[in-house]
A protein has these predicted regions:
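Short, solvent-exposed coil/turn linker segments
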Residues: 1, 50-53, 146, 161
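Substrate-recognition "cap/lid" segment bordering the active-site pocket of phosphatases
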Residues: 92, 114, 120-166
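N-terminal helical cap/lid subdomain that shapes the substrate entry/recognition surface
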Residues: 3-97
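Short polybasic/polar patches that bind polyanions
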Residues: 32, 63-64, 107, 129, ...
Length: 166
């Protein structure tokens, strides 16, 4: 593996921590006041778009499920409510089985480890710091940048070709 791969980029929720279900439940709770039919559409959209920024999901839900545009202030308020619902549960989430061992093996092999996540950057940094994971990763990146942009940036700055990144 180390002959060809020179770096590994991870998603975070559901890859490092068992936090994907926490976020699904936060979406459900956020839209519960709109009734079961709306909640099921929200859940389905969220699950079909894991790893995508929650703010993009909020805008899609407002337009396609609730039938109205979503202003910046409303989007920010939803983001704050979502974080309040999910943050403590994410901080308490267990590691995905095998994640800690895989990270340790990669560290021993000297392979740089990065995170590219759909979680907002400030929130992701807080989670990584509070879980003591900062030393595990060379860099941690979240939204508003999207994953393809993050990957291009990491590869350019670290002089990595696409076939050298897992």
């Amino acid at each position: 593996m180390t002959d060809r791969v020179r770096a590994v980029v991870f998603d975070f929720d559901g890859v490092i921590l068992e936090s994907a279900d926490v976020k699904t439940e936060a979406f459900v709770e956020l839209y519960a006041e709109h009734g079961a039919a709306v909640v099921e559409r929200v859940r389905a959209h969220h699950l079909a778009n894991l790893g995508i920024s929650r703010f993009k999901k909020f805008a899609w839900i407002a337009e396609h499920v609730l039938g109205r545009p979503l202003g910046d202030a409303d989007s920010a308020a939803l983001g704050e409510r979502f974080a309040a619902l999910a943050l403590e549960k994410v901080l308490a989430a267990p590691f995905v089985p095998g994640a800690e061992a895989a990270l340790a093996v990669l560290a021993r092999a000297g392979l740089p480890r990065f995170v590219a996540s759909g979680t907002p950057q400030d929130e992701l940094a807080l989670i990584v710091d509070r879980r003591g994971l900062r030393p595990v990763f060379h860099e941690v990146h979240g939204t508003p940048r999207e994953k393809p942009e993050i990957l291009r940036d990491v590869m350019a700055r670290h002089e990595l070709a696409p076939d050298q990144v897992l």
